[in-house]
Amino acid sequence: MTKAVGFVSALIFALATVSAARAQVMLDVSKITCDQFAGYKITTPQNIAIWLNGYYSGKRSNTVIDMQKLGENTKTLERYCIQNPQILVMNAVETIFGEK
């Protein structure tokens, strides 16, 4: 009985100390469609919009984030993407906001 208790205790300790393995997911944002963006098929639109904002801000050497404008732009992009599901989301950004 004491061997079983010791074994179970050791097993619980071992399992408790093992960190959960997290899968690393790689995305090619240039291939995300509006359908995937607006349909929450990859992640939330906000997460993708934050990345897009950083990407285009970096191209302009802009280090400031206007959080209100980011939210408004995300909603504008979502509305556009709902109406144009087959377009790539980066092309949608370039069409709506004139980014290149």
Language-model features: locations:
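Short, flexible active-site loop motifs that bind/organize anionic cofactors or intermediates
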Residues: 13, 24-27
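Solvent-exposed, flexible loop/coil residues
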Residues: 5, 33-36, 41
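Compact alpha-helical subdomains of small soluble proteins
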Residues: 26-27, 40-100
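Acidic/histidine-rich, surface-exposed loop or edge segments in extracytoplasmic proteins
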Residues: 30-35, 56
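Sec/Tat signal peptide C-region and signal peptidase I cleavage site
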Residues: 18-23
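Bacterial N-terminal signal peptides that target proteins for export
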Residues: 1-8
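Bacterial N-terminal signal peptides
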Residues: 9-16
